[in-house]
Every structure is written in C-alpha cells, then in structure tokens.
Amino acid sequence: MSIKIELFGITFENPLILASGVVDMTPELLRRAHKEGAGGVVTKSIGIEPRKGYDNPTVVEVPCGLINAMGLPNPGWKAFLEEFEKESFDFPVIVSIFGGNPEEFAFLAEKLERVGDAFELNLSCPHAKGYGLEIGQDPENVYRVVKAVKDVTDKPVIAKLTPNTSDITKLGLAAEKAEADGVSAINTLKAIAIDIYAKRPILSNKFGGYSGPGIKPIALRAVYDLASKLDIPIIGIGGITTWQDAVEFLLAGASAVQIGTAVYLKGFSVFREIAEGIRKYLEEEGFSSVKEIIGLAQKV
C-alpha cells in the first residue's frame, strides 16, 4: 500500500518529514535522511548573516527528551545558496528561514527562491534573543511576517508556531489570514536544566528548547486545537518516536508530521520503522490512504 501524500501541491512519499535543526544541512545528509525513509526534509534555519551559535554545552539529555540551545548556527544565506543552488533533489526540500522582522524574512525568501520547494518560517525559536519566540508570540507579528513573505514568493509558505503562548490558535489564525499555505506546530518549549553539583544551569545559554516524548501530549493538543479552527494544512511536531505517535497526530488533524529528537536519539532508521507501522495500521484498519484518517478524532 502506498502512503504517499499531497501537501501544498507537492508529492511526499510518506507523511514523515525530517524536522529543522536535527542534522547538519549538507546535501549528503539530507539525501541520507530520504534514503532511510523520510518523505521530505526541512533544512536548518537560515538567516541573513552567518551565526556561530552558542558555546558548548548546547544540548543536554533529560528524562523524556532533550533541551537544546544551539543559537541558530548557520552559514548565512549567501553560503547556503552557493552550496544548494547547484544541487538537485528527487524529494521535497523545505527551506527554514529566520529573521528579526518581516523585512528580513522577505529578503531571505527572495534570495533563496531558487532553492527548495517551500519555505518554513521559524517564528518560534525559544532561545535566540531577537528572533523566533520574540516575534512569534504576537499574532500581529505572525500576520506581518507571513504576509511579507507571501508578497515576494509563489512557493508554499509554512508558519512554524510556538507553544509558548496562551492560545496557539490565535497565531494559526493570523498565519491563515495572511494566506500562509500551512502551519507547523509545535516548536520546542522554553526550559532549563541545572547541574546540582556545579549549582548552575547546564547549558551555556542557561535556557533552551525542550523536545522529545515529554512534550507529545502538549503538541498533540496544539494540533487538535489548530485543526478545529484552521482550514489550511497542519504539520504536527513534538515527541513523535513511534508509528503510534504519528497516527495520533494524523487523527488529531495533522496532514503530515515532522520528526527531530527521535532521529537524534535513535538514528535515521526511525523513519522507515514509523512509515512501515503507519502502512500496516492503515491496512489493518481498512483504510486505503493516509488522507482518510486525517482529523478523524475531530469528529467524535
């Protein structure tokens, strides 16, 4: 049975997408993710200027996941474009971009128009001052950023939403009003880990983003809420490590899912395992496509 999906007019071999920020953004590693079963990939977030990121330690493993504060390390748009515009991929590549204001997002979308199949707007990084979270918590800012990007590109635009808010649906509705093609949710939760013997925060940045199985129920609720209010597709993110997790997100209303921390902890093979589990589930439950189960839990 095929578990292909159509999203934003793009064909994905399956509904599993490599999340941004998990692996280095070399073309070779993105191809490896696809070879191991990812239906598509999202690059690391690209900004206007190169960023070194934070000093180590930048990642700490905690019960039920990870806390990371990488600091949005990236080579800048010029170096990224130089490396990627000469590459061709036989699978969907979504380019993640970040900026400090709508003009910066629009600038990057214009400059990177020749690369990838869609843009994901990182409106929700919880640990990089002046970017992401500080922009993405305000529905008006979400609207302005999405609209600025939509004004300069014909490619699909996906707004990545923060869970660090009282009502994520307001952010989703703002993105939809600005004609976003879809939203992805959730990004990481702002968190901290403390070394009880050193008596100080473990990460060099003190705070980071919490990801992994521990945030799955929160992410699932966010997707469920968004699906009840929005008419545009939702990509579910947050703690997906098994095929059962992925199916839950699809039933909640996600059209596809992104997988990140599970790749860090278990390797790329997690994509094939989850894809096979989804395929068997559909067969056993009498469905002929992924599309048939999207949002079924909304109809109770």
UniProtKB/Swiss-Prot annotation:
Q: Which residues form the active site?
A: C125
According to the record, cofactor stoichiometry and binding are noted as: Binds 1 FMN per subunit.
* NAD recorded as keyword: yes
Name where it's found.
Answer: Cytoplasm
Has keyword Nucleus?
no
- Listed binding positions for FMN are S20, K44, S45, N122, K160, I186, G212, G238, G239, G260, T261
Q: What SUPFAM superfamilies does the entry give?
A: FMN-linked oxidoreductases (SSF51395)
The Enzyme Commission number assigned here is 1.3.1.14
Q: Cite the entry's keywords alphabetically.
A: Cytoplasm, Flavoprotein, FMN, NAD, Oxidoreductase, Pyrimidine biosynthesis
GO MF annotations, alphabetized: dihydroorotate dehydrogenase (NAD+) activity
Which pathway does it operate in? Pyrimidine metabolism; UMP biosynthesis via de novo pathway; orotate from (S)-dihydroorotate (NAD(+) route): step 1/1
Needs which cofactor?
FMN
Q: Name one GO cellular component term.
A: cytoplasm
Pfam families assigned: DHO_dh
The UniProt annotation places substrate binding at K44, N68, A69, M70, G71, L72, N122, N187, T188
UniProt catalytic activity: (S)-dihydroorotate + NAD(+) = orotate + NADH + H(+)
Q: Name one GO biological process term.
A: 'de novo' UMP biosynthetic process
Q: What does this protein do?
A: Catalyzes the conversion of dihydroorotate to orotate with NAD(+) as electron acceptor.
What family is it from?
Answer: Belongs to the dihydroorotate dehydrogenase family. Type 1 subfamily.
Q: How does it assemble?
A: Heterotetramer of 2 PyrK and 2 PyrD type B subunits.
Its recorded name reads Dihydroorotate dehydrogenase B (NAD(+)), catalytic subunit
| Species of origin | Pyrococcus furiosus (strain ATCC 43587 / DSM 3638 / JCM 8422 / Vc1)
Give me the gene this protein comes from. pyrD
